[in-house]
């Protein structure tokens, strides 16, 4: 297979990934592959572009490094072109409502007829099967959070609240990435393709597992946090200092002993309620939990963030200032690791945003291209799989493909 023009880099160089999906979840999987060196083809509808394009800045991050193909993959010759593309594809990711592709005639079996080694990842809100009530419903971030038990655990004691920005989309997209790579590993061993059914609500069910286990195995459900503090453990969560907010985790025998001395609670150490060797203070079960919070709040409020960070570093207590977005760029850790970077858009502008993660030492990722325009690479991709100029123009004339103007 001849690859499309692009630099060779990263741990996934030589891999061809194709995705069909809009907005965030499915495309985030494609974004990860593209930043790790895979050749990633983004399929968009011919009649209208991905709705993410209406956003002024985010698409320049989420669609960088991609090749843009505008093709009607469900109709006539457009479907034929899509299936021909699948013959040279390693991983295909589609994000839609339930078994939408199967309903339109593109089943796993049809895809495997064209490529027996193809890894297929289906990403939907409620999965490829189940009840009629749910399987075919649309889903976005908040829907998946609400249906999974994740949302009800977040927020404040007075009201649940979804986690933003778009947590379920990103977790689901990353799940698609890792699952597809796991499947590809097996395919290269057996020569037999794989189909993966990723339900966003099940991803979030798993992400919300920590507190749920107490309910599933005893009927006890953890309360929601209060003002950003850990619902179970004192000294853990969000706290206010004299000049702003920090988060901290009061965990460890020595850490608790030294902190208690600072906040005036040394006399509680070694009591039946806080015996020697205590590593965590339970907010509810320990009768001194509320007092610990009261004393800690007072001590923190009397000190600046810088003072708290210095003292906690001496005590080996984990803490961090709650940074505002403007503070990120100048933070020395961000600067040292180049966590924020710049790249050129296709129209020559400079765009700034998060850098590639994680950092591969021997085969690093790379930003080699900005977001392509609608249909920008259609002709190049179709030529790559054997279509002539006349073939491409015929698809365009029938409204089955769009090429860049």
From Swiss-Prot:
Reaction equations catalysed: crotonobetainyl-CoA + (R)-carnitine = crotonobetaine + (R)-carnitinyl-CoA; 4-(trimethylamino)butanoyl-CoA + (R)-carnitine = (R)-carnitinyl-CoA + 4-(trimethylamino)butanoate
Entry's localization field: Cytoplasm
Residues the record marks as active site: 169
Transport in keyword set: no
GO BP annotations, alphabetical order: carnitine metabolic process
PANTHER family registered for this protein in UniProt: L-CARNITINE COA-TRANSFERASE, SUCCINYL-COA--D-CITRAMALATE COA-TRANSFERASE
Name the record gives this protein: L-carnitine CoA-transferase
Species: Shigella flexneri serotype 5b (strain 8401)
